[in-house]
A protein has these predicted regions:
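Positively charged n-region of N-terminal signal peptides that target proteins for export
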Residues: 1-4, 18
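Hydrophobic helical h-region of N-terminal Sec-dependent signal peptides
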Residues: 6-10
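C-terminal motif of bacterial Sec signal peptides marking the signal peptidase cleavage site
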Residues: 14-15
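Bacterial Sec signal peptide processing site at the extreme N-terminus
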Residues: 18-28
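Elongated, non-catalytic scaffold/linker segments and compositionally distinctive motifs
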Residues: 33-35, 66
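C-terminal-biased regions
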Residues: 35-53, 71-214
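Short helix-adjacent coil turns
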Residues: 56-68
Length: 214
């Protein structure tokens, strides 16, 4: 009986030692699982960082904290087609005739200090305060209800995260029109202003550009 047990034990060792494919497969799967867990953990950490930075940015916008807002910019900003200038000078008596849209005009730190309220308008402030950050984190998108700007314009804001290029997009959609005799808004046209921010590797948001449509 004792001899039989020794033979069985030796057979078991031999069998395990001669099944390298099973051992190798288990090792490969273990490495793959660890790599996947590492990627997931890094993404979770990045998500926690950028969503907190978004909340800090939103608070700075609401509080009109210019010094805090400046950390989200790298000056000078060179915006395609000078569209940042189109926004800040839209309702201004300032004359912007130095260059055309084909030549980029730097938007400096001093320009930001002067025009930041034109950049972050009342519509931007009202909209971003209504973006649900928990929803944005979970679904990578969130949007507001339609809000009134004035008697001929309403608007809404949407926030989306594009994970392919790590970009946060804050988009204000404007609808122009009129209210009929029943108070129903009849849309005649629409336009949008896109505020694009890069989500950096440390989770900090950095302003990239403004794009205008419509």
């Amino acid at each position: 009986m004792k001899k039989m047990l020794i033979i069985l034990f030796a057979t078991g060792i031999y069998s395990c030692g001669n099944n390298p494919s099973a051992t190798g497969q288990a090792t490969t799967e273990s490495v793959a699982d660890k790599a996947a867990d590492s990627i997931t953990n890094k993404q979770d950490t990045l998500n926690a960082l950028w969503i907190n930075d978004f909340r800090d940015f939103r608070n700075a916008v609401y509080q009109d904290d210019v010094n805090k807002l400046k950390i989200y910019f790298k000056f000078p900003v060179l915006n395609p087609y000078n569209e940042i200038w189109s926004v800040v000078l839209a309702d201004s008596t300032d004359i912007f005739g130095e260059v055309g849209s084909d030549t980029l005009h730097p938007f400096t730190e001093n320009d930001f200090i002067k025009y930041h309220k034109k950049l972050f308008t009342k519509e931007f402030v009202s909209g971003i305060l209504k973006i649900k950050s928990d929803e944005l984190l979970k679904r990578k998108e969130s949007s507001t209800d339609i809000l009134d700007s004035d008697s001929t314009t309403n608007y809404s804001m949407s926030a989306t995260v594009d994970t392919t290029d790590n970009t946060l997009r804050l988009i204000i959609l404007f609808n122009t029109g009129y209210k009929d005799e029943n108070g129903k808004f009849e849309k005649e046209g629409e336009s949008s202003i896109n505020y694009n921010f890069l989500i950096q590797s440390d989770g900090h948001l950095l302003f990239k550009e403004i794009r205008i449509a419509g």
